[in-house]
Amino acid sequence: MATKVVFSLLPLLNRFDKSLLESYFQDGLRLIHYDVMDQFVHNTAFKGEYLDELKTIGFDVNVHLMVEQIIPQINFYLSQPNVKRISFHVEPFSFAKIKELIQLVKENGKEVGLAFKFTTNLQLYQPFFTTIDFITLMSVPPGKGGQAFNEAVFTNLKIANHYNLKIEIDGGIKVNNIDQIKAFVDFIVMGSGFIKLEQWQRQKLLQTI
């Protein structure tokens, strides 16, 4: 399967632009990365807004839960028809809770993923890898956009490639580093790096990656 670009909506948090997103859709973009945060990352992001607008345009939505208070959040996004995939961070939870959450998402017909900080030892969570659909590897500290790519993520990326899992990488991806990453992952999340591209660059990226 070819690597897919997923647009992080985070740069549009305070300036949602439907016409811009419609132009991205016309360019070939189909997937939106939708960040949800709480005190786990000492920040806030989206709280359910704009999902109807994204559905109207035609986007599928991948929800990334960077939260400690997860049950109300996960139940809400499970109810949203254009949310196709949900990942949540492992760091706040026990293994028993992670198992419970995986089961909850799968029972509701969504793809489920586990998300990891680049400082988290991926190998410790290997027992879950046969029960999930994908993993999200953070290549920046979670909690805000526009950060620089941290090559420490390659430690977890090498481990992840030993397993039959879809891999999503999130944070600091730009045109100057995408080539060293794309061969190892299935989904590349881009936010500010995508917005800064000229239209022809976006179209080329979406067609050739």
Swiss-Prot record:
One of its GO terms (biological process) is pentose-phosphate shunt, non-oxidative branch. Its EC number is 5.1.3.1. It comes from the Bacteria. Keywords: Carbohydrate metabolism, Isomerase, Metal-binding. The keyword Oxidoreductase does not apply. A divalent metal cation binds at residues 33, 35, 64, 170. Belongs to the ribulose-phosphate 3-epimerase family. This is Ribulose-phosphate 3-epimerase. It comes from Mycoplasma genitalium (strain ATCC 33530 / DSM 19775 / NCTC 10195 / G37) (Mycoplasmoides genitalium). The lineage of its organism: Bacteria, Bacillati, Mycoplasmatota, Mycoplasmoidales, Mycoplasmoidaceae.
